[in-house]
Amino acid sequence: MRQAAVILFKILILSIFFSTQAFSKNIILDCDVTLVGIEGKDMASDDTEVIDINLKAKTIFFGAEAIPYNLRNRINVYEGRYFKGNKRTFAIENKLVIDKKTLQSSLNKNVWDNKAISVNSYSYFDCIKRN
């Protein structure tokens, strides 16, 4: 009886370990950059970005510099926010939104200078999930 209880306990511990490994997996996306210009959307030449969504750390790492964004896991989208600075003097505020179904992404960049937005830009990304 005791040996059966020990075996069941080991199975329980192993199943918990493997289930946490399955849910802590990162989602890595390879994205083509679409620029927004005066005439509409244009594909950038040979520009790609990598988006790494770490569900366990609640962080999205974006771009070649792997800038960490705070992750909000919404029902239909992953939303990442990055803010550095003080809006009264100088600050950078970025918002990254990734659609869970289509993996379409958009990045809104705001630069605050003397309590006003001095630069406001948008970028769009067509992403493919990496295996």
Describe every region a protein language model picked out.
Residues 28-62, 86-98:
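Short, solvent-exposed loop/hinge segments that bridge or flank secondary-structure elements
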Residues 111-131:
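Edge beta-strand at a domain terminus
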